[in-house]
Amino acid sequence: MEKIFTLIVILREELVSIAVLAFLLSYCFRTQRTSRDNSFIRICMFALLHAFLDALALITVNNSAFVPALVNGILQKLLYISAIMCINEIFTYVHAIAFFKKKTKNVRIASYVLVGLAALFIILFKGSYNNVNGIIYGGGIPLMVSYGVGIFYQISTILLLIIKYREVGESFCRIMIPVRSEEHTSELQS
């Protein structure tokens, strides 16, 4: 019983994220959708995938006696790639709003090339594991690549929101700038 409670405490952020994202997705699928809604659904699905993989990776890496190292390694790499894919979708969404879909195709292609290169680095390099207060987390070069690309996209998104403030819309910027800044700060702290 104690192990289950400890697991719930460890996974509390992931469980809340999964519940909220699942609720938002179910709401979106039940209502009429616009192209903006479809973009939100893509972002939400990548975020849900990332939260699910985060929970699964935490469970498997902390039970390495029962889970093969290969499975842990694959889950960690998928976790990092899903994070990059999610922030890439947010960036391309904000870019499309800021430039009224002008030049978005080239930016989207370039962003997918960056995601592909980052995924290649993540796949090629071996990760490591860190024990922090009795909880094992992934680390190493794949994590650094994921954080580096994520921080690049965070800063790019914040700059787009600031530079294209009027085009994007004041209310959208009032929501997104603090959210992007908070996520960027939490990435730097980890």
Language model region names:
Residues 2-17, 118-160:
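Extracellular-loop-to-transmembrane junctions of the mid-late helices
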Residues 10-92, 109-127, 177-186:
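Hydrophobic alpha-helical transmembrane segments of multi-pass membrane proteins
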Residues 21-27, 89-93, 127, 147-170:
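Alpha-helical transmembrane segments in multipass membrane proteins, preferentially the mid-helix core
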Residues 32, 65, 95-102, 165-172, ...:
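Membrane-interfacial segments
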Residues 159-186, 190:
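Interfacial "cap-and-anchor" motif at the non-cytosolic start of specific transmembrane alpha-helices
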